[in-house]
Amino acid sequence: MSKRKFKEELLEALVPEIYGPAADVKPDIKPRVLKRVKKREKKEEKEEAGLLDDGVEFVRSFAPRRRVQWRGRKVQRVLRPGTTVVFTPGERSVTRALKRDYDEVYADEDILEQAAQQVGEFAYGKRGRYGELGLLLDQSNPTPSLKPATAQQILPVTEIKRGVKRENKDELQPTMQLMVPKRQKLEEVLENMKVDPSVEPEVKVRPIKEIGPGLGVQTVDIQIPVRASSSTVSTAVEAMETQPELPEAVARAVAATREMGLQTDPWYEFVAPTSRPRSRKYTTANSILPEYALHPSITPTPGYRGTTFKPSRTRSTRRRRSVRRRSRRTAPISVRRVTRRGRTLTLPNARYHPSILV
């Protein structure tokens, strides 16, 4: 026996409560419960059992239940503002079975104002930051020949506005103002002019003008081409008569038989702006290459950029004795000049391995 076995036997004899053999612990296993399956009764036995019931027939043992028993949501009842609460001991103050009184059904007179201001019973939910905006406007007129016909108004932006988490100070607020010529009356311009959709408007973007600390205004002039309406053209055509005045009787007879032909739309001679196609000039690929240095083992090809790298002597302050090594003289590279498309190219002659048969 080993020393370990001796020690185990001695410890079991001296301290049996610690080193003694473990007590037999029965495993906690639940006994398996077997459900006995009731055998199906035969049809004859069922008929005999039905005769013993003294002819009593049970249609249903209980009423059919609904498939879904939905009791509704549990809502926390909150008193509407303005409702008077009366407490009477021993009496229920809430009658849930009855409907609300008509005094409670009718709302306040300023219910719409409360909804707009989100106060009273409408004081819930997130509030959007859509208050009155204060904008710094530029009153200067970069086009002196035009006068403002309308005030500066904020353009409605069609973007989907989501919840504003932080105040966006860099947000643009575009404004619009209609300008008309100074020499024409405002009524004539608005009534007698029509927009010509065939002609594209001329857009001129002006530089940003600083109107405050860290705030600027950029003016964009959009010149919309207009055309005169039919009424103004008809008056102009009627006034152009070069015939001499006729007697009154002859003029009536001529007016009865003559048909008036009026020009409704003026004739515009529209010439499309002809722009020359830009001819892009690309330089040769050799001019794009930078000045580069080749490895000393590479012999530079004549006609191309690149020089052999030579280390400068200023790098080492200590003078070294250089032992000249005799290097084999390399044969000069043979070059041929080829003219293609009027350009002379300097190409090196290819040298092949002796194993390659040309």
From Swiss-Prot:
Record's GO cellular component terms: host cell nucleolus; virion component
Assigned keywords, A-Z: DNA-binding, Host nucleus, Late protein, Viral capsid assembly, Viral release from host cell, Virion
Biased composition (Basic residues): 312-329
Top-level lineage group: Viruses
Keyword Membrane: no
Signals that turn on the gene: Expressed in the late phase of the viral replicative cycle.
One Pfam family per UniProt: Adeno_PV
Extent of the signal sequence: none
Region called Disordered, residue ranges: 296-331
InterPro entries from the UniProt entry: Adeno_V
Designated name of the protein: Core-capsid bridging protein
